[in-house]
Amino acid sequence: MTHPFATKQIPFFLTASAPCPYLPGRFERKVFTRIDIGEGPALNDALTHAGFRRSQGVLYRPACEACDACKSVRIDAEAFEWKRRWRKIAARNRDLHVSIDAQTATMEQFDLLSRYLDSRHGDGDMAGMSFGEYVMMVEEGAQRTHVTEYRDSDGVLRAAALTDVLKDGLSLIYSYFDPEWERRSPGAYMILDAVRQAELAGLPFVYLGYWVRQSRKMSYKAQYQPLQVLTPSGWQPHAELAYHDMEDEEDDFD
């Protein structure tokens, strides 16, 4: 399958069926295309707006035959509701130094990621990732991309978020943090800080990837309101749709 984009045809491919990582007993398929140098930033913008996610040099979205549980979501940063819980988390982490200067992978980031994966996702797909694979994760297919770093008062890296800058917002690709700092809710703080960064940059949205209402791992994203959900009719306010959501603790972005 191809689709016209600018002056060229963009080829799309379909993966084979595989077990769903979010809903037991279900199977997933994905449609994907590769990002080429040159038109990459514009393609990333257009397809993210259409519900795709970037992973290294690939843009993909679910194309499951009998399930549409994965919903692309984005926060309306301009109207974000800073409820008491969010204000407390922001205050708890206000001593952190935030930098958006890192555009390449570092061993310091990788060491932190390895500790995070060992603590929270020891049996996941990313377990045992090598430094070379991490470099590919950060740098391959990068489209106006940076690693937002969060350091304590001693300069120690405590959390990081791989972030794409789009025309209409920030897309949070993956986040990780020091497991010993979990009581500070660093995952939630990185989302809140992305909202702050988007506001400062005049960008209306923060893209969080896929929200899966039936998955306790992925349902937490509905806590960040106002949230918009991509539907067959376009982006719609989550609050106006007939969902009854579970709330769960923070996680990384998918």
UniProtKB/Swiss-Prot annotation:
Name assigned to this protein: Aspartate/glutamate leucyltransferase
Alphabetized GO MF terms: arginyl-tRNA--protein transferase activity; leucyl-tRNA--protein transferase activity
InterPro entries cross-referenced by the UniProt entry: Acyl_CoA_acyltransferase, Asp_Glu_LeuTrfase, N-end_Aminoacyl_Trfase, N-end_Aminoacyl_Trfase_C, N-end_Aminoacyl_Trfase_N
Enzyme Commission numbers on file: 2.3.2.29
Function: Functions in the N-end rule pathway of protein degradation where it conjugates Leu from its aminoacyl-tRNA to the N-termini of proteins containing an N-terminal aspartate or glutamate.
GO CC annotation terms, alphabetical: cytoplasm
Keyword line: Acyltransferase, Cytoplasm, Transferase
NCBIfam families, sorted: PRK01305.1-4
HAMAP family membership: Bpt (MF_00689)
Enzymatic reactions: N-terminal L-glutamyl-[protein] + L-leucyl-tRNA(Leu) = N-terminal L-leucyl-L-glutamyl-[protein] + tRNA(Leu) + H(+); N-terminal L-aspartyl-[protein] + L-leucyl-tRNA(Leu) = N-terminal L-leucyl-L-aspartyl-[protein] + tRNA(Leu) + H(+)
EC category: transferase
GO biological process, one term: ubiquitin-dependent protein catabolic process via the N-end rule pathway
Family membership noted in the UniProt record: Belongs to the R-transferase family. Bpt subfamily.
Subcellular location: Cytoplasm
